[in-house]
Each structure stands twice: as C-alpha cells, then as structure tokens.
C-alpha cells in the first residue's frame, strides 16, 4: 500500500470514528434529558422507577396542601387521577395558578412512596388540563364505561371557513 492511499485510509477511518462518537454522544445526551410521564395509578402500582427523574401529573387533591411551619418554601400535597393518590413533596415557590382541584405536572423523582418534585407546573387557565392527564383520565373513564360530564374531554368544535363580503373570511361553527 502506498503512502497516499494509506494516508487517505487513516483519514477516512478517523472521520468515521469521530462521526460514530458524535452520534453516540448525541444519543446519550437525549437519553439523559428524557423524562417519562407517569400518572398516579402507575406510580401507586410501582411502575415508576425509584430515584430516576420522571414527570407525574394529576389533579391536586382538595385539602391536601400543607406548608411546613418552619420553612415557607416546603410544601406537601397529593395528586390524583381519581383512581390512585400520590403524595408530593416540593421545596420552592409554587406557580401563581397552583390550586386545589386543578391540574399539575411535576418533575422530580420517586423516593419511597413520596414523589419529590424539583419543578411544579400548574394549568394556565380554567379550561386547561395537561394533555397527558386528560388522556389518562379519558382512558380511565373509558375503561370504567363512564362518560365524563366535563367538557375537558370533548374535542374542540371544528371551525368552517365561509366566504364573506370583500376580501375577508368569516368563521362559523360547524353543526
């Protein structure tokens, strides 16, 4: 093998090795940033891993919010999907929209039977429910054969575009 060919072969091998290492590092980084979602039923069943970052979502149980009298930032509350309830411990400032009987998604890890949250996100208006929570509740209601009375599970009414006067269009609700 002559020197030019050998040099090209080494260059191609080094480039290929570098590309493989870069791809593996990207895959590793994505894996580290992935947070799996668990509803309270799955957490109570023991499906959620211990001491691994996950997301948990549900409705805050009424009268479950307790603040530590010695530390104003330490809060304990419970979340439910109406099948199971999970205790949550959080150290920090809760979002302004955090309230009992409202939807939350918390990021943290399971430590024993308690979900220790590092971040708590609250719903942003009175009609919003996190998509994962809504899907979980809808599945639970379907499994029980219960039709939810809440409009939170109803699909949005499609909007039909009709031609109006001039260069604009008018939106009307389809029936």
From Swiss-Prot:
Cellular-component GO terms for this entry: plasma membrane
Entry GO MF terms: heme binding; metal ion binding
Transmembrane parts of this sequence: 9-29
A Gene Ontology BP annotation from the UniProt entry: cytochrome complex assembly
Region feature (Disordered): 142-175
Alphabetical UniProt keywords: Cell inner membrane, Cell membrane, Cytochrome c-type biogenesis, Heme, Iron, Membrane, Metal-binding, Signal-anchor, Transmembrane, Transmembrane helix
Keyword Transferase annotated: no
Presence of keyword Zinc: no
InterPro entries from the UniProt entry: CcmE, CcmE-like_sf, NA-bd_OB-fold
Name of the molecule in the record: Cytochrome c-type biogenesis protein CcmE
Stated role: Heme chaperone required for the biogenesis of c-type cytochromes. Transiently binds heme delivered by CcmC and transfers the heme to apo-cytochromes in a process facilitated by CcmF and CcmH.
Family, as annotated: Belongs to the CcmE/CycJ family.
Chain sites annotated for binding heme: 124, 128
Cross-referenced Pfam families: CcmE
Compartments reported by the entry: Cell inner membrane
Periplasmic side: 30-175
Residue intervals annotated with topology Cytoplasmic: 1-8
SUPFAM superfamilies linked to this entry: Heme chaperone CcmE (SSF82093)
Membrane topology: Single-pass type II membrane protein
């Amino acid at each position: 093998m002559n020197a030019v060919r050998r040099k090209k072969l080494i260059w191609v091998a080094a480039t290929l090795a570098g590309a493989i290492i870069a791809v593996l590092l990207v895959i590793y980084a994505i894996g580290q940033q992935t947070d799996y979602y668990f509803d309270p039923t799955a957490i109570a069943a023991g499906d959620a891993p211990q001491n691994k970052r996950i997301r948990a979502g549900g409705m805050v149980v009424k009268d479950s919010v307790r603040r530590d009298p010695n530390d104003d930032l330490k809060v304990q509350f419970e979340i439910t999907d109406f099948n199971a309830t999970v205790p949550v411990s959080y150290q920090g400032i809760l979002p302004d929209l955090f309230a009992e009987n409202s939807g939350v998604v918390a990021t943290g890890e399971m430590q024993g039977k308690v979900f220790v949250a590092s971040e708590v996100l609250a719903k942003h208006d009175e009609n919003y429910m996190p998509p994962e929570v809504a899907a979980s509740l809808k599945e639970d209601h379907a499994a029980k054969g219960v039709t939810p009375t809440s409009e939170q599970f109803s699909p949005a009414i499609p909007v039909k575009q009709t031609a109006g006067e001039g260069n604009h269009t008018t939106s009307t609700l389809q029936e």
